[in-house]
Amino acid sequence: DIQDIAAEMRKVKKGDTPFQERRAIAYAIAMIEKKVGAKLGIKDRAGMEFGGTGDPTQQDCVDEATNTTSYLLILQSHGLLKYHTVGIPMTKGDLLKATLQGDPVKYWPHWTAVIQETKTGQRFAVDSWIYANGENPAVVEVEKWYIKDIDNLPKATN
């Protein structure tokens, strides 16, 4: 399977740059999610669907951040990351604002996996929770990730 993932990463890269590696990472994460989802019966729908509470096929952002971090560590351990290292998952959110505005979901803390560009130190969120299982995650600078609220999350990396 790792050979298939490496081949997919090579196929989607349009050059040997950190940006193209992030693009390839997005495709690799989507590919791994499809394979793992099929084996485990995960049919994760996009984003927060509270109707999915108790549904074992639905994951929250903590599950997604944990799984994506694990997948990134696999890519790293197999030498598939040249320009990035795997970082510690991070969270952003504002519980006080959620409480004061009476909308706990909109401003709830949200988790993501993180990669760090080795040359610049720039950290990037790798957020697979936003999209359905097997779709490309958003890979975006952490400063631009989840800056306003849950309705303004970044687009998928294609």
Which sequence ranges carry the predicted segments?
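Proteins with a high burden of low-complexity, intrinsically disordered sequence enriched in S/T/G/P/A and R
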Residues: 1, 60, 97-99
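Acidic/histidine-rich, surface-exposed loop or edge segments in extracytoplasmic proteins
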Residues: 1-16, 45-54
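Weak global preference for isoleucine
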Residues: 2-5, 25, 29-32, 42, ...
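Mixed-charge, polar/low-complexity N-terminal
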Residues: 11, 16-18, 95, 105
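Mid-length scaffold segments of soluble, non-membrane domains
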Residues: 20, 24-85
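Detector for Asparagine
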Residues: 67, 133-136, 152, 158
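Hydrophobic/aromatic-rich core segments of domains that either
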Residues: 73-145
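Low-complexity, Gly/Ser/Thr/Pro-rich intrinsically disordered linker/tail segments
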Residues: 142-158
